[in-house]
């Protein structure tokens, strides 16, 4: 199983603001692009992939939207507007939820009111965590564990205080090269590296 977490610090937790954020300061289109590149390949979708989007621009609780490739049925296509609409439906389903609650949105998609920190604590129990960092070990040289989870951010960097928490969870830093890439580009390179290794 390959898992990805995108910490979308600028992404709002209401569907209206999310949709308005496409192409604007929040850059919510990154969610659609990352979903497309984690889940889909030409004429098919990948098996055994999970992506978690943690949307943090909120007045109450962060929203963690989880999409499981093995369980999604008909998401309606894989162009940007369709994919961002799936995220918006999850946000609509989360209205009125209390802290640390979960709701199923549709097959393969759930929404939870949990923070990034809480999510990665849970994932660390049965995944090896990898954080992308230009100063990390080059991915071609890195040993990737059997149940990897890759941590990414939107255009707002990971807060420095998060690094110590992630380190305590055994997170390893890996690098995809000298250039700072979009999260949606990173997932393509990670998938390709693991595909080449016949993971």
Swiss-Prot record:
<dbReference type="GO" id="GO:0008757">
    <property type="term" value="F:S-adenosylmethionine-dependent methyltransferase activity"/>
</dbReference>
<dbReference type="Pfam" id="PF04013">
    <property type="entry name" value="Methyltrn_RNA_2"/>
</dbReference>
<keyword id="KW-0963">Cytoplasm</keyword>
<keyword id="KW-0949">S-adenosyl-L-methionine</keyword>
<dbReference type="InterPro" id="IPR029028">
    <property type="entry name" value="Alpha/beta_knot_MTases"/>
</dbReference>
<keyword id="KW-0808">Transferase</keyword>
<dbReference type="InterPro" id="IPR007158">
    <property type="entry name" value="TrmY"/>
</dbReference>
<keyword id="KW-0489">Methyltransferase</keyword>
<feature type="binding site">
    <location>
        <position position="132"/>
    </location>
    <ligand>
        <name>S-adenosyl-L-methionine</name>
    </ligand>
</feature>
<protein>
    <recommendedName>
        <fullName>Putative pseudouridine methyltransferase</fullName>
        <ecNumber>2.1.1.-</ecNumber>
    </recommendedName>
</protein>
<dbReference type="GO" id="GO:0008175">
    <property type="term" value="F:tRNA methyltransferase activity"/>
</dbReference>
<feature type="binding site">
    <location>
        <position position="186"/>
    </location>
    <ligand>
        <name>S-adenosyl-L-methionine</name>
    </ligand>
</feature>
<comment type="similarity">
    <text>Belongs to the methyltransferase superfamily. TrmY family.</text>
</comment>
<dbReference type="InterPro" id="IPR029026">
    <property type="entry name" value="tRNA_m1G_MTases_N"/>
</dbReference>
<dbReference type="GO" id="GO:0005737">
    <property type="term" value="C:cytoplasm"/>
</dbReference>
<dbReference type="GO" id="GO:0030488">
    <property type="term" value="P:tRNA methylation"/>
</dbReference>
